């Protein structure tokens, strides 16, 4: 990869691989109470069951789709124009915002006036930023606490349900055995929800708009949806909903360009990224972010202190509240949906990290720790937190309260510094909620398995059930190059215990900046972890996809096995390495066991034999054993035979 290859806005184009529909899938939309509430889902078509296995119809299944218009063949994709402003009419209809005459951040104005950035700027934005009218609060939490169900909340309820009821009805009407099939395919193991309201003994039959509103009002969930990012498709982060995942992208001083970061974003959402964080620290941070936001159907998060540090040439001690405030406004007016802010790094906690194995590993945390020590005073993020809340509620930017003192090794897990900061984050949450500002809490980090639940329990207690958003955690430190696996283990566990969103880790963690392939690997690993957590919690309908794939596997519907899986391309590639011919796609075996030792084929043979003999499967097995016993004696009762 070249260091910062030349990017020109005139040449910008979408990556063709990111816009092709997935195999046997099509984009469908479910309409809500008004015509412009059109909720996207991915419909996966299945083949009929072969006649020998019953011959029934297998209706399509529906899965959560984060890819936006990119996988819709009917959508015209032009990244120079950006995505349609899906939520614009809803925002305008509320009548509590105003269009500004122009940018109001000093840095934004400077970039707009700089001729050197002209060929890099996003050309398709033809509207000025919005802000709350004086005295107004435009957060989804504020509306929820007023008893208002917004279009965003209705959209989310439809999206979370994934047409589960319609799928069960389609099974019932699939043929004479429809009722039996519906019971089988809808079966799900009871979960253990650890107190989550929507699961366990009190599991909801479906997610309703009122339930969404209530969870937002309580602070147990957030809808990251800046009024200046109307292109975003509403989604929710909370432990009573599907576990979500975040993908990190962003350039550095030594690698990547604007074009590559836009490609990474479209690639991440294709494979299931629910949100994307732009962690750019290199050149053209402002322009890179604009391109990403205008083309993103998912919420975008940032760490504003990174850009603020660039404005003072990397010298943490030179940071000021005024520079940081201007950065917040700059990014809020672009449309950033949530800010990671390390306001819990207090002066008193910094000495507690002295005896750590790995010290302070968070970039934002180390920046603020250095500032606190240089000035020997509390951080300006902590001191000005109420003023930050005023900015957040003017644009509906959500807090992601950063864990600047998270452990960077399992040696440091659950130490006094980490837990002291967590307690402070709980206190800051209460302040934000006083302003009706949405909050989620960031968590570790590196934590061995036996300490993971303690992290979750303390967070729920101290932060009053505000959504938890964790980086893994990594459960061991011995696997550079495989940290997507070491962290995926911890992610599945903490997701089960109650974490609402998991921040992915790629194979490049601790080693380098991820490329597109690494992004996909991290996404798929974390989709697995999130889904495993949904199953363990007992999320309604979570097992539908597993049941459909298992049925396809038992019936040797190879194409359906590939297509229902999280990564159809890799599944097909692995199968075709040893059985590449088209005939192998309908064969009743795979290359692992071959045609004579396939356990599923043997089971099918037993069932056929039972049907022919008019006996039960148990009797058929017994009868078959008796036949084989006679055959064994007749051939000499030898365990081994010479060829």
Curated annotation (Swiss-Prot):
Note on how the cofactor is bound: Binds 1 [4Fe-4S] cluster per subunit. The cluster is coordinated with 3 cysteines and an exchangeable S-adenosyl-L-methionine.
Pathway: Cofactor biosynthesis; thiamine diphosphate biosynthesis
One of the record's GO molecular function terms: 4 iron, 4 sulfur cluster binding
Keyword set includes Calcium: no
Enzyme class (EC, first level): lyase
Residues that hold [4Fe-4S] cluster according to the record: 590, 593, 598
Keywords attached to this entry: 4Fe-4S, Iron, Iron-sulfur, Lyase, Metal-binding, S-adenosyl-L-methionine, Thiamine biosynthesis, Zinc
GO terms for cellular component: cytosol
Positions contributing to substrate binding: 248, 277, 306, 342, 362-364, 403-406, 442, 469
Pfam families in the cross-refs: ThiC-associated (PF13667), ThiC_Rad_SAM (PF01964)
Residues holding Zn(2+): 446, 510
Cofactor list: [4Fe-4S] cluster
Gene Ontology BP term (one): thiamine biosynthetic process
Highest rank taxon of the organism: Bacteria
EC number: 4.1.99.17
Keyword Iron-sulfur part of the UniProt annotation: yes
Function noted in UniProt: Catalyzes the synthesis of the hydroxymethylpyrimidine phosphate (HMP-P) moiety of thiamine from aminoimidazole ribotide (AIR) in a radical S-adenosyl-L-methionine (SAM)-dependent reaction.
Subunit composition and interactions: Homodimer.
Similarity remark: Belongs to the ThiC family.
Name the record gives this protein: Phosphomethylpyrimidine synthase
Species classification: Bacteria, Pseudomonadati, Pseudomonadota, Betaproteobacteria, Burkholderiales
């Amino acid at each position: 990869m070249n260091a910062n290859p030349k990017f020109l806005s005139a040449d910008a184009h979408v990556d063709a691989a990111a816009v092709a529909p997935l195999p046997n899938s099509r984009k469908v939309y479910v309409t809500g109470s008004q015509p412009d509430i059109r909720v996207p889902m991915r419909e996966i078509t299945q083949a009929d069951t072969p006649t020998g296995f019953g011959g029934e119809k297998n209706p399509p299944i529906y899965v959560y789709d984060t890819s936006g218009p990119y996988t819709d063949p009917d959508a015209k994709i032009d990244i120079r124009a950006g995505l349609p402003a899906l939520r614009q009419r809803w925002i305008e209809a509320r009548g509590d915002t105003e269009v500004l005459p122009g940018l109001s951040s000093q840095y934004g104005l400077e970039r707009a006036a700089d001729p050197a950035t002209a060929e890099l700027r996003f050309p398709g934005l033809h509207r000025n930023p919005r802000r709350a009218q004086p005295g107004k609060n435009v957060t989804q939490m504020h509306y929820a606490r007023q008893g208002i169900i917004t279009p965003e909340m209705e959209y989310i309820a439809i999206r979370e349900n994934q047409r589960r009821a319609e799928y069960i009805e389609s099974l019932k009407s699939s043929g004479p055995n429809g009722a039996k099939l519906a019971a089988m395919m809808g079966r799900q193991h009871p979960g253990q929800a650890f107190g989550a309201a929507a699961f366990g003994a009190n599991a909801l039959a479906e997610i309703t708009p009122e339930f969404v509103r209530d969870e937002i009002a309580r602070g147990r969930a957030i809808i990251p949806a800046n009024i200046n990012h109307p292109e975003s498709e509403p989604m929710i982060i909370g432990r009573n909903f599907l576990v979500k995942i975040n993908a990190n992208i962003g350039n550095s001083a030594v690698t990547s360009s604007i074009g590559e970061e836009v490609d990474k974003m479209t690639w991440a959402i294709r494979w299931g990224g629910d949100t994307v964080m732009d962690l750019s620290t290199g050149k053209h941070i402002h322009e890179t972010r604009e391109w990403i936001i205008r083309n993103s159907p998912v919420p975008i998060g940032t760490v504003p202190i990174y850009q603020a540090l660039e404005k003072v040439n990397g010298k943490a001690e030179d940071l000021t509240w005024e520079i940081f405030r201007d950065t917040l406004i700059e990014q809020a007016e672009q449309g950033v949906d949530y800010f990671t802010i390390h306001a819990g790094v207090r002066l008193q906690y910094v000495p507690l990290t002295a005896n750590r194995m790995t010290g302070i590993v968070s970039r934002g945390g180390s920046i603020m720790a250095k500032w606190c020590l240089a000035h020997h005073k509390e951080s300006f993020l902590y001191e000005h937190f109420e003023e930050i809340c005023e900015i957040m509620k003017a644009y509906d930017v959500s807090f992601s309260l950063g864990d600047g003192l998270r452990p960077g090794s399992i040696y440091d897990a659950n130490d006094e510094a980490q837990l002291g900061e967590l307690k402070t984050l709980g206190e800051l949450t209460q302040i934000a909620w006083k302003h009706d500002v949405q909050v989620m809490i960031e968590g570790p980090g590196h934590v061995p398995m036996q300490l993971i639940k303690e992290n979750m329990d303390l967070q729920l207690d101290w932060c009053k059930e505000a959504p938890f958003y964790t980086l893994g955690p990594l459960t061991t430190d011995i696997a550079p190059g495989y940290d997507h696996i070491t962290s995926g283990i911890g992610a599945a566990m903490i997701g089960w215990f109650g974490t609402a969103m998991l921040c992915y880790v790629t194979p490049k963690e601790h080693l380098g900046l991820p490329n597109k392939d690494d992004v996909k690997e991290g996404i798929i690993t974390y989709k697995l972890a999130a889904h495993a957590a949904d199953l363990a919690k007992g999320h309604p309908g979570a097992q539908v996809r597993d049941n459909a794939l298992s049925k396809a596997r038992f019936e040797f519907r190879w194409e359906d096995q590939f297509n229902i899986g999280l990564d159809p391309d890799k599944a097909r590639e692995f199968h075709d390495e040893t059985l590449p011919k088209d005939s192998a796609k309908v064969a009743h075996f795979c290359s692992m066991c071959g045609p004579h030792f396939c356990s599923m084929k043997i089971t099918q043979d037993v069932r056929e034999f039972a049907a022919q003999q008019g006996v039960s499967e148990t009797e058929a097995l017994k009868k078959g054993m008796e036949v084989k016993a006679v055959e064994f004696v007749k051939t000499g009762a030898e365990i081994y035979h010479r060829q």
